[in-house]
Amino acid sequence: MTWTHKQFAQYEINETYFDRLVELYDPRKYTNTTYASRGFWAGSRWYGDVVMTCPARRTAHWVSPHQNVFLYFFRHEYKVLPIIEKVAKAPLGVFHGSELGLVFDVPIILDAAEEQLSKAVIQFWTSFARTGRPVSEGQEWPAWSIEKDEVLALDVPMQVVNHSQIGKAEVCDFFDSIGPL
C-alpha cells in the first residue's frame, strides 16, 4: 500500500476513490529533499487543497449567486526567501499566510516588483474594506462566477487565471463529487 493510500484510508473514502486520489497526489510527481519526502510534498498539496483552496471555491459557488465574491491564489515566492530558508534550514516556498508580508509592515526586503505587488495588494484590501470591491491601479480583479471560475493570481506579474489553469478545477471538482472531508 502506498503512502497516499495509507493517508486517505483514515477518511473512509471507498476504494473507488483511491486510484483517483493517487493520480491527483502521486508522490512521484514531487522531489525528495533533504528536509522532506515526496510523500510530505504530496500530503502538503492535498492538505492545502482540502482545507483551503477547494472549500474557498465551494463557498464562492454557494455565495456568488447572492453577492460578489473575490478569490485570489497567492503564488509569489519572495526574492529574499533563500536567505530565510538558510536560517530556517528548510525550503519554505509559498505557504499559508505568505501574502501577509505584503499587506502589513513586516520586516522583509522586497525588490521593486515586489514593492509594486505590495502596493497593489494593500490597495485591493483597503478598497475592499471601504467599498466591498477590490480595486488597484492597473489591475482588474473580477468577481468570481461559476461560468468563468476565475481567481486573481497574486504574483509578479499579477494575472487573472481560471482554476483549471492552476490545476485546481479538476481537483476541487473531484472533492466536490465526494462531499466535504
Language-model segments: what does each one mean?
Residues 39-40, 64-69, 77-78, 109-181:
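Alpha/beta-hydrolase-fold serine-hydrolase catalytic core, especially in secreted/extracellular enzymes
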Residues 1-115, 124, 131:
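Substrate-gating cap/lid region and adjacent catalytic-acid/histidine neighborhood
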